[in-house]
Amino acid sequence: GCYDKITAINGKRIDDFGSYDKAVAAVRGKAGGVVQLGIHQYATNQDVTLSVTRAEYEQIHVTSRMLDNQIGYIRIEKFADNTDEQFDAAVKEMQKQGAASLLFDLRNNPGGQLTALVNCLDTLLPEGKIISLKDKAGKTEKYTSDANAVDLPMAVLVNADSYSAAEFFAAALQEYGKATIVGEKTVGKGYSQQGFELSNGGCLNISTHCYYTPKGVSLIGKGVTPDKQADLKNKKKEHFYVLRDSED
C-alpha cells in the first residue's frame, strides 16, 4: 500500500523476528528508553532510521460517535483490562450527546477478559445474572449486575468472527430483551483456557471452565443466532436503525 513501513527494529529486520508479537515486544520497554526504527518512506522511496523515545500510553479498545437519527455508535475492538472504563465513558458520552438509541459493534471482536465483559454488561443490564462458569468438578461461579441500567433501545452487530466474550455480550443483551442482535451467527466459543509454559519454550493451553449465558445456555459449537440476519463483513455497513419491537 501507499504507506511508510517499519522495516527494522534496533537494526534487526522485521522479517527476522518471526512473529508480530516478538516484533512488538522489541519495541516495548521502559518509558524514556529509546528504540531505533528503520523506516521505508513511500513518498521518497528511501530508507531512514528514526530514534523514538518510549512513553506510556493507553490502548484504545472502545471508540464512539453519533450517527444519523441520534444513534450512538460504540465499537468494541476487544475486552482488555481497560475496555470497561472506556466503554462506560463512551456510553455516558453518547447519552450526553442525546443518543436516542445505542448500536454496539462487536464484529471481528476476539473476546478477551472476563472481568471487562462483566463490567461492560453491568453498565447496561438491570439487576440479575450476567454469566456463570463451571469447572470439570461442577463448581460454579456466578457474576451478577446491579440495579443500575441503561434504558435505551439497543442493537448489537456481530459476525462469524465475533468470538468468546463478544458472543456472551450479545447473548446476555439478547436474553434480557435489551437489544436486537444483527448480523451473522457467531463462532460458538464457550470455554476458557489456562496457559502453561513448556520447557521447550512453547505453551500449552488447557480448557478449564465452560461459560453459560444468564439463562444457563452453553454457546459451545452453537454461537449466537442473530435476530436479524445480515451480511456485515463490510465495515462500512454500520448504519442500522435501532427500533423498539413496537416500531420494528
Task: Pin down the residues of each PLM region.
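A short acidic/small-residue loop/turn micro-motif
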Residues: 13-14, 55, 226-227
